Structures are given as C-alpha cells and as structure tokens.
Amino acid sequence: MKTTVGSRPNKYWPIVAGIGVVGLFAYLIFSNQKHSTESGDNIHKFANGGSYRDGSKSISYNRNHPFAYGNASSPGMLLPAMLTIIGIISYLWRTRDSVLGDSGGNNSCGEDCQGECLNGHSRRSLLCDIGXSFYHCSMAIVYISKQYTYGDWSLLLSRSELCEDLWNRGYEPRSYCGHPPLAEVPFWGISDVGRFNQCFEYSS
C-alpha cells in the first residue's frame, strides 16, 4: 500500500498579507495629508503664510519653505551646472593620455612595442600587478613548475608568485599596440599553453 504524506499548509501567509494591507493603508494615510484650511476657532489659514486679525483675535502663520509646492527647481543653477560638467569632461579628455598610456588619439606605438608606450608604469609593475588580472589575460590560475630539475609541475602557485617567476624568466605581458611573434614556452609546467601564449611573450 502506497502511502503519501501531504505537505503542511503554510499558516503564515494570512499574517504576512494582513501586515502588508495594514502597512499599505498606513502609508496612504500619512502620505496623503489634507491641507488644513481652518484653525480650531474657525479662523482662516493662509495657504502660504501671512497673518489675520479680527477684532481681538490675531493669528500669524510662518511662510512655507521656498522649496515647497514644487518650487525646488532652480533654473538659475542650470548654466553653472552645465559649465562644471563641461569642465570636468574637458579635463578628463586632456589627461586621457597619461591615464590610458598614450593610446587615446596619439598612439605612437610601433610594431615592436613591448610596453614602453605605457606612460607612468614600468613593465614589471604592470606584470606583477595582481589587480590587473594578468594585464588583459583571462587566465585565472596557471600551473607552473617551481622545481624544473625534478619536473615537479603539479605545484599550484599564486598569481603574485607566478608574476615574479615569469618576469625572472624573461616574459612580459603582451602589448595592446603591436603583436610581436610569441616565443615557445621553454620550460615544463604550463597548463593550457595556448592561453599562456595569448597573454605573455618572451622578450629577453
């Protein structure tokens, strides 16, 4: 005889629905306040401040904030804001070469460019910058041998260790501006040689 156990009904959904309905009504009540037009003694209230005097009774109201009732926009600030934005864009455009490494409009790199055209950055710092994720390489982890003599290539190195090791063996990241012929990998221990060749070149 086959026995099936039914799923337990969810008894919390009415509570959640009730809290949602009450919260919705509370939001509508507090967000749709009617503007009071009369005081407790039936003296008219001015919509935007002012004062009222009737015999011995006098009442005064503070004026509304200048930004009230849709007056928050300031047309007089449009021109200064536009000039500020134009100034920032102009500054970034003029300094793009120092940021992009002379690759934004004034590219003087030749076919033999090995990375010298990147202003302000040494090739070693580019190679060993972990945050650059191996320059533009999509390779996350590479297996490389630390003990080349014994052929122990199963050792997993961190990216910083791999950067230092590749630099010491004469490798540099490929440059964006020029694609010199890539050298063959002269040692054991590289996993996925094709992806390695897309990222580094032998320069020494």
From Swiss-Prot:
Protein name in UniProt: Movement protein TGB2
Bilayer topology: Multi-pass membrane protein
Function description: Participates in the transport of viral genome to neighboring plant cells directly through plasmodesmata, without any budding. TGBp2 and TGBp3 are necessary for intracellular delivery of TGBp1-containing vRNPs to plasmodesmata. Can gate plasmodesmata and increase their size exclusion limit. To a lesser extent than TGB3, induces host actin cytoskeleton network thickening, which probably plays a major role in virus cell-to-cell movement.
Keywords: Host cell junction, Host cytoplasm, Host cytoskeleton, Host endoplasmic reticulum, Host membrane, Membrane, Transmembrane, Transmembrane helix, Transport, Viral movement protein
Record note on quaternary structure: Interacts with movement protein TGB3. TGB1-TGB3-TGB2 complex formation is enhanced by ATP hydrolysis.
Transmembrane residue ranges: 12-32, 73-93
Subcellular localization(s) per the UniProt record: Host cell junction, Host plasmodesma; Host endoplasmic reticulum membrane; Host cytoplasm, Host cytoskeleton
Transmembrane helix in keyword set: yes
Organism in which the protein naturally occurs: Barley stripe mosaic virus (BSMV)
